[in-house]
Design a protein with these regions (language model features):
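Low-complexity, highly charged intrinsically disordered N-terminal segments
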Residues: 1-44
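Acyl-donor binding region in acyl/amide transferases
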Residues: 33, 42-172
Length: 172
């Protein structure tokens, strides 16, 4: 298999991602770069990657760095993978999520992001969609490229599944 990494316009990327994944591709303030990964022999899209400005506060990251970083400096040198999504069945059959994560850590992507933002990125971070509730993550086994530094914490409620939503809506 051969792959190409193509930077996409927001609207096209968002439409394709929304048809593939179970969430809406909402925008965050700050930097954003959107890529699709295609298998070149079949011209099939096998994954989506969206980079953006890192989260302002992340306890595992702050613990790893020893303190809350100076955000002006940190935001110039760090980038976050917000959506790292393989299409199916490529994701399951060929460990597509690991390929997408490895692409995020590649020198080619780093060069493109450095050029786009006129900086030198030295940290890539991401969070796992399901945390540890499934007993594993697609990022497991990615060392030395990605290292687990702890679970993030949130006070947001999980999104309700499609099955229970109508029942709860009627109840309320």
């Amino acid at each position: 298999m051969n792959f190409s990494i193509i930077q996409m316009q927001s609207k096209t990327f968002d439409t394709l991602l929304e048809m593939t994944a179970s969430f809406s591709p909402d925008e965050n303030p700050g930097k954003t770069a959107k890529y699709i990964v295609k298998e070149t022999n079949t011209n099939t899209v096998v994954g989506f990657i969206r980079f953006g400005s890192p989260l302002i506060n992340s306890k595992p990251r702050n613990d790893y760095l020893g303190d809350v970083p100076d955000l002006d400096i940190f935001n110039k040198r760090a980038i976050m993978g917000f959506n790292i999504v393989p299409t199916q069945p490529f994701g399951f059959n060929y460990l597509g999520g690991k390929l997408m994560a490895a692409i995020c850590c590649s020198s080619d992507i780093r060069r493109q992001l450095n050029k786009k933002y006129d900086t030198e990125f030295c940290l890539f971070e991401t969070t796992s969609l399901y945390g540890n509730i499934k007993g594993g993550s697609m990022y497991d086994g990615m060392r030395p490229y990605l290292r687990y530094k702890g679970d993030t914490q949130s006070k947001f409620l999980l999104t309700l599944g499609e099955e229970i939503y109508p029942e709860l809506k009627a109840w309320f």
